[in-house]
From Swiss-Prot:
Name of the protein in question: Pimeloyl-[acyl-carrier protein] methyl ester esterase
Any one GO BP annotation for this protein: biotin biosynthetic process
GO molecular function per UniProt: pimelyl-[acyl-carrier protein] methyl ester esterase activity
Protein family: Belongs to the AB hydrolase superfamily. Carboxylesterase BioH family.
Pathway: Cofactor biosynthesis; biotin biosynthesis
Amino acid sequence: MSVSVERFGQGPDLVLLHGWGMNGAVWHGIVPALASRYRVHLVDLPGFGNSPLAGEVEYSLPWLAEEVAAILPEQCHLLGWSLGGLVASQLALSHPERLHSLITVASSPCFMARDEWPGIAPKVLAGFNQMLAGDFKQTIERFLAIQAMGSEHARDDIRQLRHWLAERPAPQLAALEAGLGLLAEVDLRDELTPLSLPWLRVYGRLDSLVPKASIPLLDERYPSSRSVVLEKASHAPFISHPQQFIEIIEHFVG
């Protein structure tokens, strides 16, 4: 299949991967600033936006990573938000020679809550799966609300996400279902331990999908990585706090 990419600007290559249910247009608010310094690549992950799935595929994390690897510049800085952070992390494991650095935003190597691990309650993801089977659009709306929950600009954040989501074709049900499966099942905590790439982890302290309690655990597990927490942000800090987010990225990437 062909993965759709939108490109802006000139400079070092910076590739942005969106999260579950979204598409590459979600970055449009910060593109002008980033494109003044970087060659920005906005990817639509398979099954989302302008990257329709071609027939039946085994929608696994390694498969997703290979599909994205096929359209990456020879070397780049790779940024992934939420589910896109899992894809970016898998790429860092499978193709470290292609990356100058890894940036994960509001993401976790293990999204699902487990023994002594804070994360999304299993019943929440199970609820989304049930909703998907019944009301596709309502499920997306509910997820938008959860992403903005806690943000002091929650209503504006949701409106902005909804606007950008509508700029491209709706996500395919198969990709939504498979994506929820990845959020429920993938656990890269041990695999990422030896990662030697420069790695920046960006969080919103008010995020209800990536609990703040996981941040010090990840700091301890990955001491060579750096973490930055936006105190008043939730799951979409690049939308609620764009200027602060841009400064964080520019400071790290250079």
